[in-house]
A protein has these predicted regions:
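Secondary-structure boundary elements
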Residues: 315-317
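Bacterial N-terminal signal peptides that target proteins for export
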Residues: 1-9
Length: 317
């Protein structure tokens, strides 16, 4: 009898983890192990979820941390001394072809050595990369490559290789596309050096990176046009995470959106709450033409925002 009692207790103890998981699953996620995050963390209040709370406890929220002229000088120093940020409008008339072909070939060589997965779960094999290399047509790059300047006319992705197909390090991390290099908003300046065999992709250098961008997303311009557009005044700067751009003053014909920090030449519309921004468009010949688009006044700043604690807090929220 004692032996049966001990055995019963052992069985109950062994079953407790499984029984507890059944109870947990009623309040947890579908698998019983994931829980919704609490609305408030310990030691916090709901007021802390508003910018006003933090502005209210700051001793001097409207103090200018760095004046605008000092910020401009700082930016010039960054561009000049680090070389991290490039200015396509100041590029020479030509680049050495080996510089462009070497960079493009190096990217292909690196990616093809990583054993990445394709979207269908198969490995990206030699046949896959052979097709891409054929499209890259790097042998057509001359010794001296003419620099063609352009502006981005549609929000676009810059790819490490000229393809829309995504590659993953594993099928458990499909949220990270290993071929995505960057993304650029309307109005971004860039230089074009080469096109794929089918003409759909362009090898480009932007202020921050280089890679392949779809040809249909850029409009070619002269150096003078680029400099004028980038420095035109008055201008507005987008302040929302995504600022909607419309083709009509009534804000009904949606064109695109621009992320925070985009600068566009502007002019008043005469209508309260609406501002006209000048955007680059691509015409049938592939050239850049400037046309007006319209934004809500509350989603942009006339000129750059002042560098104050209030500004930083508001933008963070």
């Amino acid at each position: 009898m004692k032996r049966f009692l001990v055995g019963g207790i052992v069985c109950v103890l062994l079953m407790l983890p499984f029984l507890s998981s059944c109870v947990i699953s009623k309040t947890g996620g579908e698998d019983g192990f994931h829980y919704p995050a609490p609305a408030l963390l310990p030691g916090t209040t709901s007021a802390m979820n508003t910018p006003g709370f933090w502005i209210g406890i700051h001793p001097d929220p409207d103090r200018v941390v760095i004046p605008a002229e000092d910020l401009e000088a700082f930016n010039r120093t960054i561009r000049k001394e680090t070389g991290v940020i490039q200015d396509p409008s100041s590029f020479p008339e030509t680049f050495q072809g080996s510089r462009i072909s070497g960079a493009a070939q190096g990217s292909l060589r690196f990616i093809s050595s990583r054993n990445y997965f394709r979207q269908d779960g198969t490995r990206a094999d030699a046949e896959f990369f052979s097709g891409i290399q054929e499209q890259m047509n790097l042998s057509a790059i001359p010794e001296e490559v003419p620099v063609r300047l352009a502006l981005v006319t549609s929000y676009t992705h810059q790819r490490i290789l000229p393809t829309d197909e995504e590659l993953y390090s594993s099928m458990k991390s499909t949220d990270l596309d290993r071929l995505q290099n960057s993304a650029y908003d309307i109005g971004t300046p860039l230089a074009v050096f080469h096109a794929t065999r089918d003409g759909r992709w362009l090898y480009t250098i932007t202020p921050l990176s280089e890679g392949w961008i779809k040809a249909e997303h850029v409009g070619y311009c002269t150096r003078e046009q680029m400099v004028h557009y980038l420095n035109a005044e008055p201008f507005v700067v987008t302040t929302g995470s995504k600022t909607d751009l419309f083709l009509d003053q009534g804000l009904r014909r949606h064109h695109a959106y621009a992320r925070m920090g985009c600068r566009f030449p502007s002019r008043d519309t005469g209508s309260p709450g609406v501002i006209e921004a000048l955007l680059p468009f691509r015409n049938e010949e592939g050239k850049c033409v400037l046309k007006g688009a319209f934004v809500m006044a509350g989603q942009v700043s006339r000129g750059y925002l002042p560098y104050t604690p209030r500004t930083i807090i508001l933008q963070a929220f």
